[in-house]
């Protein structure tokens, strides 16, 4: 974005903020008759100047996740609850069928010790565990990043490699294909087993399928959600009825055939 573009953006921001301030002032002038409703200003997708997230229609992004700036999410991928993908200083690319689980953080590097400008690149069918941190690194297809693991600037996790839960992968570390690394700092532990390799692929598929169910539920409006509650309440059976039914179906209570 050039100087003129930034100037127009700033003017637009000031106008919006001024309008909101006038609205608040008008409400207060109504005295005891005014009503103030607290609204969340959280935006799942947020641009940073001219950088706007690009999410495929077939991907799922949880409503309380945050994607900002230059972020691309491929088809069938899922960004779960509480995740933050912040592409404000550089780009983040997430391939197809990848799942980034709850509370994970993906960021980029504009400056670091090596002086390199580093994006974060995540391939296809990758599993990123809960509360993991990825910063200016590359993760190839069908790799597995464990829960609460940290992968730092310039690190490269190759295809079918695994970073164990809680591990810290230091800057510019390369984890070869088919290896498991763990510890702080992360070191080679052993080779990936065939069962684990199959699990990497199946985990990505299972999360992709689960994301579709969550996307359907999150897409429902208030009326649809309330109707579903009423329907469930109407069809619910009384616990006393269930207890009587259980007594009747005990083997000793089932009448014998003549």
Curated annotation (Swiss-Prot):
Q: From which domain of life does this come?
A: Eukaryota
Q: Which GO terms describe its molecular function?
A: carbonate dehydratase activity; metal ion binding
Which BP terms from GO are recorded?
photorespiration; protein homotrimerization
Q: Where is the transit peptide?
A: 1-43
Keywords in alphabetical order, please. Lyase, Membrane, Metal-binding, Mitochondrion, Transit peptide, Zinc
Kindly list the cofactors needed: Zn(2+)
Recorded hits in InterPro entries, A to Z, give: Hexapep, LbH_gamma_CA-like, Transf_Hexapept/Carb_Anhydrase, Trimer_LpxA-like_sf
Its Enzyme Commission number? 4.2.1.-
Cellular compartments annotated:
Mitochondrion membrane
What would be one Pfam family of this protein? Answer: Hexapep
Positions with a binding annotation for substrate: 86-88, 101-102, 209
Topology class, membrane:
Peripheral membrane protein
Q: Where does Zn(2+) bind?
A: 107, 130, 135
Q: Which Gene3D superfamilies match?
A: Hexapeptide repeat proteins (2.160.10.10)
User: Record's GO cellular component, any one?
Assistant: mitochondrial membrane
Assembly and partners? Homotrimer. Component of the oxidoreductase respiratory chain complex I; element of the extra matrix-exposed domain, which is attached to the membrane arm of this complex.
Task performed by this protein: Enzyme involved in the catabolism of H(2)CO(3) but that does not mediates the reversible hydration of carbon dioxide. Mediates complex I assembly in mitochondria and respiration.
Provide the family line.
Answer: Belongs to the gamma-class carbonic anhydrase family.
Name of the protein: Gamma carbonic anhydrase 3, mitochondrial
